[in-house]
């Protein structure tokens, strides 16, 4: 009896360890799921107000996510908690089980950032009030910053999820909200540096929809402050070698505005061929964005 109990206890302990610590490879993806909430939209040629994401688009989302099979999925444009619960439940029904999920509700009442994961979070930090000064007045990063910590065989890895201000103009003296977006990026950068003052020794990812291209002030701000390198963008392309992640359908414009940025301390875990922009079946029907993913090599150093 004692032997059986000991074996059972060891089995439970081993199972717990396996469920908490990530070893070998970890696939991380970022995906703007385009209004997974109530929104005004065209549905089958009819304009609908406060209408949920159509079932066809939701089915396409699940197909896309299933093809990538990320271990950790950073999401933008998620609705309030009931919508995340619905998303998580329908993924599970499709054979995509993400038992760990967290949502950040910040200043934007309609669209939020979230993380779904196959592995448990060691820690969750909801940075809902990230301050900035905009035209002399105190403001905050509209959608906040969601941080989750994952335990791996090479040490903890932190994931910061952001969705910077869109290009919708809210003030005539800030066309396309360029200044607000840049200030948000700088506030996010300062938060990351507060958490990790020495990025060269840190292991983190900044993921999400930055609503600007890689040569712009927001993207530059997130990569470097003064002489301090915060991170580098993961090179990513689709099966045709194209790098765009967003389409503005009305104007037929294609751009890369969704990114995965890795700290210098985590960069050795990124494979030589970088990441991927998914262009498989269902991607056009699922969202106006394409997901970006990377497989991190977290094999313990011997």
Language-model regions, residue ranges each:
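Metal-dependent phosphoester/phosphodiester hydrolase catalytic core
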Residues: 153-183
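Metal-dependent phosphoester-hydrolase catalytic domains
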Residues: 140, 190-205, 211-302
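Catalytic metal-binding/acid-base residues of hydrolase active sites
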Residues: 34, 78-79, 163-165, 210-213
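N-terminal, active-site-proximal structural segment of metallo-dependent hydrolase catalytic domains
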Residues: 7, 21-94, 105-108, 185-189, ...
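Sec-exported extracytoplasmic/periplasmic mature domains
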Residues: 66-70, 74, 83-96, 121, ...
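Second-shell loop/turn segments in exported
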Residues: 46-52, 69-77, 101-103, 134-135, ...
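Structured beta-strand-rich core segments of catalytic domains in phosphoester-bond hydrolases
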Residues: 78-164
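Bacterial N-terminal signal peptides that target proteins for export
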Residues: 1-17
